[in-house]
C-alpha cells in the first residue's frame, strides 16, 4: 500500500511510524510511505504557507497555492488514483470498520492541517474525505495521520507475523467486542497469579473463559457496544450471568451514554 502524507512537519511523521510493526512493514516493502512538505512548493524568499484570515480573528490560515502545487507533485509522482483525506476534528470518526475500508485502498493521500486550518476553498475543491481521530483538538493533523497510517498498515496482508493476532484485537472481531485479558510467564507473581483455567490445557474451557472475559470487559467498559454486537445464544447466556453479577450502575450508564453521543 502507498500512503502519501502532506505535512509542514514531515519529520514528525517519519519518527512516529518508523518503529515496531509499521517500521518493519516499510523495510519489507509492505508500506510505501512518502512525506511531502507544502513549504517546498511555496513561492518567494520566505516560502510562506499561511496568511491572516479574512474577516479578522486569531491565528493564520494555510494558503491554497502551496497546497495545490504540493498536491500536483504528489499526484504526478504516481499515476494511481488516490483519495485526499484531510485530518480534521470536523471529519467522520475513525473506527475499526472505517480503518478496514481504508486498508482496502491501494493508495491514499493524507493532508495535515496547521494553525487555524486550511483555506476552505481548497477543502471544497480537492478534499475527498475529512477524517477525525476523536472529539478533541490537536495542534495539527500529524498525530492523526500517524494513527491512520498505523491502523491501516497493520491490516495489510503479511504485516503482522500472526494474522490471528489482528483478528482477535479489540473491535476487530465480527462482533466488535473488547479483547480478553492476556498473561505470560511467570504464572505466579506478587501482582497476582495466572487464572487456573489458562494453565489447565482444556481448550474448550479456555475458549469459554476468554469469551466470557471479552463480554465482561465490554459490558463493564463500553456497554453501548453490546447493543451493536452479534451475539450467539451461548453468548447471551454468558451475558445474562454477567449482568446478574455485575449490574450496571448509574455512573456507567451516564458514561456509556456520553461515549455514544
Swiss-Prot record:
SUPFAM superfamilies: alpha/beta knot. Its main location: cytoplasm. It catalyses: guanosine(37) in tRNA + S-adenosyl-L-methionine = N(1)-methylguanosine(37) in tRNA + S-adenosyl-L-homocysteine + H(+). GO terms for cellular component: cytosol. Its EC number is 2.1.1.228. GO terms for biological process: tRNA N1-guanine methylation. It is found in: Cytoplasm. GO terms for molecular function: tRNA (guanine(37)-N1)-methyltransferase activity. Specifically methylates guanosine-37 in various tRNAs. Belongs to the RNA methyltransferase TrmD family. This is tRNA (guanine-N(1)-)-methyltransferase. The gene is trmD.
